[in-house]
Design a protein with these regions (language model features):
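Fungal secretory targeting signals
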Residues: 1-21
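Well-ordered alpha-helical segments within folded domains of soluble proteins
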Residues: 415-426, 485-497, 559-568, 627-638, ...
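C-terminal catalytic domain of Rieske-type non-heme iron oxygenases
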Residues: 397-398, 402-403, 539-541, 659-728, ...
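Acidic/histidine-rich catalytic neighborhood
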Residues: 519-573
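Aromatic-residue-lined binding/catalytic grooves and analogous aromatic/hydrophobic interfacial grooves
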Residues: 21-480, 498-500, 518-521, 560, ...
Length: 813
């Protein structure tokens, strides 16, 4: 665990809550103007502890904290009695035989008989707003302030705001504590004003929510608080219940009263009182462990009220200093695991983040290394804030939403987005924070996914498709081009395999990882078909749709590459996973030998997206579709780059490059999205093409990042979609290292390449604590040209070679 530095001891030891000046490393988001409450998602700084999220915005003396809870959703069995997770009431697997025959005879077909029901899918939604206002300032119309400064410390997870008004200096701080499972707000001033605290949601009607206030006077040790309780619908059935309490920390010396008509808690500081702190807790009656047939797939748990009451009481009984100390120690133990240090040639460290983003120009080949470093650190910060043991994994908006209906439901899209959210965790010391992902798949996907496999495909094992909520929606939705995506679980098994490779956690593998992997392999063993179109004897997927692109057909490269990886993973870990079924292993081995590996070169030298002949007209030049589905085995996967030897094979490299050039820069009319650009950046990095990798990284920053560093889907226009925030970290790591697994038959010493695509603009940088497959870490640094010159291998026991991009041996075990 990293010790508290002098730059953080101010919070714990000094009487002020002011932050120290930022260090040279890129660890702060900085603003000199308030976050705009009319444009929250592009200006507010986010806080989170995995389960809870805050978005802080509002003018001085009118601060607002928008509150999210990971499990607060509309839809599912909470809102309709016959919700089926998109599954049919009876098997439709009989339609597959005729559909497959048609596809093999004609090249394309349809999956109409498998399409499902989208109704009552639901959406992630905001809980409400906590507002902290100063009535005397509002009555006088005085909300302007001098010297305004807000700063989000990415190392400690603390947001501080400072300003002066009417002769008083005011400091506020906010953080979301994982150890205490609350978010905390504090205000300090030598002339502390009276406050009004409200908790509510103006988007929700009064019939669905109840706001109460308790002044804490004369009722034992119960502290003053405001409370918001609600349901997503009255019913029947009754919708999801939610409960939130904002409670004054007991050490605050104040007088309190309630304005019951508005549910407002009025706080008047006592003589000599210079600070007031408030803890906020929230929960729902969602229970992930009740998503099985035994519980009718209900996911309905106990009323959240008692737990929220107990949790906020316990937190409010502590001092602000103790709350802050435990939070910072916890946060630093995670952010201190890994560091990337890039130069700051433009002296950007003291420039507001919005200005850095506004002036950033992708055409400037030097970019701004400080901002690029900052956004990398932000990726890790956002993951720590949105993914903690006991929470759900980050969704399309991470943990931060401001409405009742999020874009794309704020769900789990699993044809690039959910995967991209987890690109950096294994390598940056955050691999243990992926437990929400494993539990979500085990609790939410597997139980009903087994039903989907049986009803749609007549198959063993389990399967899900492209879009999943938190209510076990594992069936197809209603549009084949995006819903016919049975490869989602196969792709997620790459993350299962990677977690094993980096963590070497055999207990987890046997208990959770391998059973999921085996179930996916069993499904695909039952579904592969002998290719009757090409008549080459290979095994292919039929039917398939390349994600969101092209026809329903057979042998989609994306599917074939992912099934290839699933089978390789099974054979690599079956012993460690405790496999006892020799027949299963034999079937995987024989199917892998016959499997079409998803690599074919087309008429114009490209890797083909479909096995169909190019004469069908689907794989054409300058098709700038947002997805790079046929390159999944290049990056982030490795069936092409490693198992087929692509990283050192010019034929594969040329076909990948040809497709990347044709697919464009990620700015097509269908989606000018940041995630499309950073995926391209990572693919170019794996080709050792520094110029293109850095350009796509710069282009994403220039085009898709808002003032608060959040990535937007269409240029800088909403909606907010967090995947590029996480994906930018993956792109940077791809420029720093090539650490590929080997096929299960390969017993040679593995080689890791450091600095495959480090731009000269990053010259003189270094990395500390980069995790490696098979265990251990590496620290390294590079010269002004971007060539790694020094590396130190730590905690590594098995054989490994570390080289730079020129092949120079840097370290060896």
């Amino acid at each position: 665990m990293r010790h508290l530095t002098p730059q953080h001891l101010w919070i714990l030891l000094a009487s002020t809550l002011l932050a120290a000046p930022p260090p040279a490393r890129a660890k702060f988001l900085l603003a000199t103007t308030p976050a705009n409450s009319s444009d929250v998602i592009r200006s507010a700084y986010p806080l989170g502890n995995g389960r809870l999220g805050f978005l802080a915005h509002g003018a001085p003396f009118v601060e607002v904290l928008t509150l999210n809870v990971d499990s607060l959703w509309s839809g599912g069995l909470f809102e309709v009695a016959n919700y089926t997770g998109g599954n049919p009431s009876a098997s439709v697997a009989g339609s597959l035989e005729g559909g497959r025959s048609w596809v093999f005879e004609n090249g394309t077909g349809n999956v109409t008989g498998l399409l499902g029901d989208d109704r009552f899918y639901g959406s992630y939604r905001v809980l409400g707003n906590l507002s902290i206002s100063v009535p005397e300032q509002q009555r006088g119309g005085k909300t302007e302030a001098a010297g305004y400064r807000r700063m989000l410390d990415l190392a400690s997870g603390v947001l501080t705001t400072t300003f002066s008004a009417d002769g008083r200096d005011v400091e506020t701080s906010a953080f979301c504590s994982y150890p205490d499972q609350v978010c905390v707000y504090a205000i300090r001033s030598e002339a502390l004003p009276a406050l009004e605290i409200r908790l509510g949601n103006e988007l929700v009607g009064s019939m669905l929510q109840n706001v109460t206030c308790f002044d804490g006077n004369g009722y034992g040790n119960e502290t003053a608080h405001v409370r918001l309780r609600g349901v997503t619908q009255l019913g029947p059935p009754e919708g999801m219940r939610y409960d939130a309490i904002a409670r004054i920390v007991s050490g605050s010396s104040v007088q309190t009263s309630c304005t019951n008509s508005t549910g407002t808690l009025n706080i008047v500081p006592g003589n000599g009182t210079t600070s007031i702190a408030i803890v906020v807790g929230a929960g729902t009656n969602y229970d992930a462990k009740k998503g099985t047939a035994e519980f009718g797939y209900s996911f309905r748990g106990e009323d959240p009220g008692p737990a929220v009451e107990a949790n906020t009481r316990a937190a409010a009984a502590k001092t602000l200093e103790n709350l802050l100390k435990s939070h910072i120690e916890d946060f630093l133990s995670l952010t201190g695991c890994f560091s990337l240090s890039l130069p700051d040639p433009l002296n950007s460290a003291e420039t507001p983040t919005s200005e850095l983003i506004a002036r950033y120009n992708a055409k400037d080949t030097t970019g701004d290394p400080y901002l690029e470093n900052l956004l990398f650190d932000y990726a890790n910060y956002l993951f720590i804030s949105a993914s903690r043991p006991g929470s759900l994994p980050p969704n399309l908006q991470g943990r931060w939403s401001e409405g009742l209906g999020a874009a794309w439901s704020g769900d789990y899209h699993a044809n690039i987005n959910l995967q991209m959210n987890h690109w950096t965790a294994d390598q940056t010391g955050l691999t243990d924070l992926q437990s929400p992902l494993w539990n979500y798949m085990a609790d939410n996907w597997v139980p009903r996914g087994q039903e989907t496999a049986r009803l749609l495909y007549g198959a063993p094992g389990w399967v899900v498709h492209n879009e999943m909520n938190i209510f076990g929606h594992t069936g197809m939705k209603s549009g084949a081009s995006w819903a016919n995506y049975a490869a989602a679980a196969a792709w997620m098994m790459q993350h299962v395999f990677d977690h094993w490779e980096y963590s070497q956690d055999a207990v987890w593998l046997q208990k959770q990882g391998y059973p999921m992997l085996k179930g996916v392999a069993e499904f695909w063993l039952s579904q592969l078909q002998v290719d009757e179109f090409s008549k080459d004897g290979s095994l292919v997927v039929n039917p398939c749709n390349s994600p969101e692109h092209g026809p329903t057909t057979f042998g989609c490269a994306h599917f074939q590459q992912l099934v290839y990886q699933v089978f390789e993973a099974v054979l690599s870990v079956e012993t460690a996973g405790g496999e006892a079924d020799g027949e299963f292993v034999t079937n995987v081995t024989s199917s892998l030998a016959r499997l079409d590996k998803g690599f074919h070169i087309g008429d114009w030298g490209q890797i083909k997206e479909w096995k169909l002949p190019d004469s069908f007209g689907y794989d054409f030049t300058n098709d700038t579709h947002r997805h790079l589905s046929e390159l999944v085995g290049w990056y982030p996967g490795y069936s092409l780059s490693s198992f087929m030897g692509g990283y050192s094979n010019s034929t594969i490299q040329d076909a990948v490059a040809q497709k990347l050039y044709s697919r464009g820069e990620g700015n097509a009319e269908d989606a000018n999205a940041g995630w499309a650009k950073v995926w391209r950046s990572a693919c170019w990095a794996r080709l050792n093409n520094t110029e293109r990798a850095h350009f796509e990284l710069r282009y994403a920053i220039d085009t898709n990042f808002a003032d608060n560093g959040f990535s937007m889907y269409s240029g800088t226009n909403t909606p907010f979609q967090i995947d590029a925030n996480y994906g930018i970290g993956g792109a940077v790591l791809s420029m720093l290292i090539v650490d590929l697994p080997t096929a299960f038959r390969d017993n040679s010493t593995r080689t890791v390449i450091l600095g495959p695509a480090i731009p000269a603009a990053w010259g003189g940088g270094d990395v500390k604590g980069l995790a490696l497959r098979g265990g251990g870490f590496v620290d390294f640094e590079w010269n002004d040209e971007g060539t790694v010159t020094k590396a130190e291998l730590k905690n590594r026991s098995t054989s490994l070679r570390i080289v730079n991009k020129d092949g120079l041996l840097l370290a060896e075990v």
